[in-house]
Amino acid sequence: LADEQKAFLKRFYYDRLNGSTNPIWLSAIEDLNTLEDNRIYLVVKKKHVDGDHKVKYAVIKVPDRVFGRFIKVPSSDGFDNIMYLDDVVRFCLPLIFIGTKPSTYEAYSFKFTKDAEMEMDNDADYGAMEKIAQGVNSRKRGEPIRVIYDKEMPREMQKRVFERLNVRE
């Protein structure tokens, strides 16, 4: 990224993204099933750069439903560049974690789908649309059945995400 693009992304963070990218420390949550399914998340590895080199993990929901999947980033050559919103969030990780010790960051995307068991029997008390609505509502409480994750995600991070989702690999 050119310097003016970096400045644009920082302004974008402070003006728009700030407040919608709240990290959840993995140490503070046992079960990621409470998160909304079919959303894009980043799992972040934050490693202190000072003497202790302490490592912490967090999850950040990418606010794509608010800002869209792509962000137009202007450039000095007159062309607009397009960035994935999750890449913008990755770039802004030092701003998101600004009140913490200086660190290096690794972030990888994942999303999961919860089970929505829908039994379509011939119950005359409910119409098909009511049954589908009940199935969609039960999905909020369902167990994750599928996880999609960045192919570059290190194995140890995959294990952390899968364990917190109670999903076998």
Regions found by a protein language model. Give the residues of each.
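N-terminal non-catalytic structural scaffold regions of very large proteins
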Residues: 1-169
